[in-house]
Amino acid sequence: MMNYRLFLLDEAVEFLLALSSADRRFLRAKLEAIRDFPTHHAEYYRRDAIGRRIEGCVAGKFAIEFWEDTADMDLKIISIAWADGRSPRRR
């Protein structure tokens, strides 16, 4: 188990706040599981503009992207979105 702190970018927080409480609870549990064992949850990866490895997974109806900041011991959640690509305002 990693001892990462969990950080969410503003856009991820805004997405979470627009969800039902049940969806927020589901995502909170998934984010904590990812924080504890990030590599167990990585289903794909891509490189960002500076070459950093961004990993992602699908959790139910949500897509989550994150990266491990090993220098700061943070797991940074950079994106939470609908897995089917729909608009953030629709449920």
What are these regions (language model features)?
Residues 18-21, 36:
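Secondary-structure boundary motif
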Residues 32-58:
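A short, surface-exposed loop/turn module that caps and links secondary-structure elements
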Residues 6-9, 21, 49-51:
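Lipid interaction determinants
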Residues 4-8, 38-40:
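Short amphipathic alpha-helical segments, especially helix-boundary/capping motifs
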Residues 1-5, 14, 18, 25-29, ...:
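Enriched for short, Lys/Arg-rich terminal
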Residues 22-23, 45:
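Short, mixed-charge, low-aromatic patches
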